[in-house]
């Protein structure tokens, strides 16, 4: 039986535009799914149903219908303020009080015409790829004994389970790509500075940038176009990327056309190999092999490339710790209520000297220069997105040092794209076989890392893989519930 959530975000937008469904009807459909299904998934921490209905009903009076996401239901990652709604930040350490103003990313999505259904779950302050917090557990819809990854945990689960047609997350070390890979989605981390509302210059190292989580490559292009479109709002970040796009056309067009022949490097090794025991599951290797096979059939050149052996891991850890050191300054915070991992990161961050932080930043700058140089002859570099299958609930444990090491071993290829500012996309090329020790049908993704400003090439290659592997037809059980 056909239902509205079976449509892609692009198709749904077109339906609304042509009058085959109203924004309110679409909003009601998705709210009903959230009410029926989310208790077993934990994608949302707050559902603002009445506010969503009121906005959808009056959307034509609030936002021009020409806006790129007009009428599409969405949700806000619970790290970003929406006026009148509490921002929980995945923590029990803060009082539950309504935010006074919208974060620029939230305002940009409103300006694009979306209808927010509420706030989606994130681990504490977005500082982990876990999906377990003191506020609750977010579960993977492909196997609810397993985690969806993080930190855009709730956003990924909501899209995969058909609770929203698409979502925007933020990615400071893999936080869009990790949960997208674990839940069978496309996840795109744009180049640093590409998205004006969140240009990647806040926080130490300029690591974080907003990006889409979608079921198809074309939907990812559509959301990226919306994120970079002028909003009519005051410019929050005057230093956003200004690479001219003249003649290249919208990102959506690149994703739909899927044209081009490129040179792809298949990466051997990771930047964490000297520090963490990175064990790559055969299913992760099989995903890369499947992608290599299809890319070769399409006509791309495929070569091996070795990971440069330059310092990285300790400097990244210092950057992560130093970003946690600011948390004691958050108004009203109760540090005794922090989870063990974040409390440990805060303590280590506060013990750092300014010289140590500056040295780490210098090391990461040198790493970026070396990495971009090593990748320069390729249009994209291919890695597994995750080294392992989606992790069981509780796998990270309570020891913070081991927790951090496990995060790095699980996603050893994601954070280097944040450090270098390069765009990267995860693509859900396969699932585990039935005879896999962790069970069959678990999503496995590959990552393509592009050149600076190279999102269109990543989207084009993703579209070529999608046409042949047809992952957009693969869904978890909740899809038909």
Predicted regions and their residues:
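Acyltransferase
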Residues: 20-28, 57, 250, 280-305, ...
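Short glycine/serine-rich loop segments
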Residues: 101-231, 418-431, 436-447
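A short helix-breaking turn/cap at a secondary-structure junction
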Residues: 189-285, 468-481
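Glycine-rich, small-residue loops and helix-cap segments
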Residues: 19, 71, 111, 164, ...
């Amino acid at each position: 039986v056909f239902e509205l959530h079976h449509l892609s975000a692009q198709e749904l937008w077109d339906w609304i535009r042509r009058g085959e469904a109203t924004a309110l009807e679409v909003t009601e459909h998705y709210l009903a799914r959230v009410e029926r299904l989310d208790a077993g998934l934990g994608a949302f921490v707050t559902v603002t149903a009445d506010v969503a209905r009121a906005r959808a009903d009056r959307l034509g009076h609030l936002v021009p219908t020409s806006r790129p996401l007009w009428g599409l239901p969405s949700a806000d990652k619970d790290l970003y303020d929406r006026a009148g709604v509490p921002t929980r930040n995945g923590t029990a350490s803060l009082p539950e009080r309504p935010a006074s103003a919208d974060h620029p990313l939230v305002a940009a999505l409103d300006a694009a015409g979306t209808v927010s259904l509420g706030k989606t779950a994130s681990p504490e302050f977005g500082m982990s790829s876990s999906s377990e917090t003191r506020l609750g557990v977010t579960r993977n819809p492909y196997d609810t004994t397993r985690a969806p990854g993080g930190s855009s945990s709730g956003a990924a689960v909501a899209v995969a389970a058909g609770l929203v047609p698409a979502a925007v997350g933020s990615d400071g070390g893999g936080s869009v790509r990790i949960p997208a890979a674990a839940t069978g989605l496309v996840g795109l981390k744009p180049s640093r500075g590409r998205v004006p509302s969140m240009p990647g210059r806040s926080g130490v190292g300029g690591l974080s940038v907003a990006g889409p989580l979608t079921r198809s490559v074309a939907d990812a292009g559509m959301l990226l176009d919306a994120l970079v479109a002028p909003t009519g709002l005051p410019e929050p970040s005057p230093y956003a990327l200004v690479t001219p796009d003249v003649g290249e056309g919208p990102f959506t067009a690149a994703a739909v056309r899927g044209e081009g022949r490129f040179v792809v490097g298949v990466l051997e090794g990771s930047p964490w190999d000297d520090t963490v025991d990175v064990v790559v599951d055969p299913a992760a290797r099989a995903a890369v092999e499947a992608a290599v096979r299809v890319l070769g059939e399409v006509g791309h050149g495929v070569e091996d490339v070795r990971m440069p052996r330059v310092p990285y891991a300790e400097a990244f850890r210092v950057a992560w710790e130093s970003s946690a050191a600011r948390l004691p300054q958050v108004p009203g915070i109760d540090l005794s209520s922090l989870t063990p991992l974040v409390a440990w990161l805060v303590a280590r961050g506060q013990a750092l000297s300014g010289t140590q932080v500056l040295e780490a930043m210098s090391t990461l700058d040198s790493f970026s220069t070396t990495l971009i140089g090593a990748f320069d002859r390729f249009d994209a570099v291919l890695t597994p997105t995750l080294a392992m299958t989606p992790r069981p609930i509780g796998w990270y444990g309570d020891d913070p040092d081991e927790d951090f090491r496990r995060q790095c071993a699980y996603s050893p290829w994601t954070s280097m794209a944040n450090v270098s500012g390069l765009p990267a996309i995860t693509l859900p090329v396969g699932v585990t076989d039935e005879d896999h020790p962790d069970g069959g049908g678990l999503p496995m993704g590959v990552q393509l890392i592009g050149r600076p400003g190279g999102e269109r090439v990543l989207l084009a290659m993703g579209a070529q893989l999608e046409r042949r592997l047809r992952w957009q037809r693969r869904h978890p059980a909740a899809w038909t519930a």
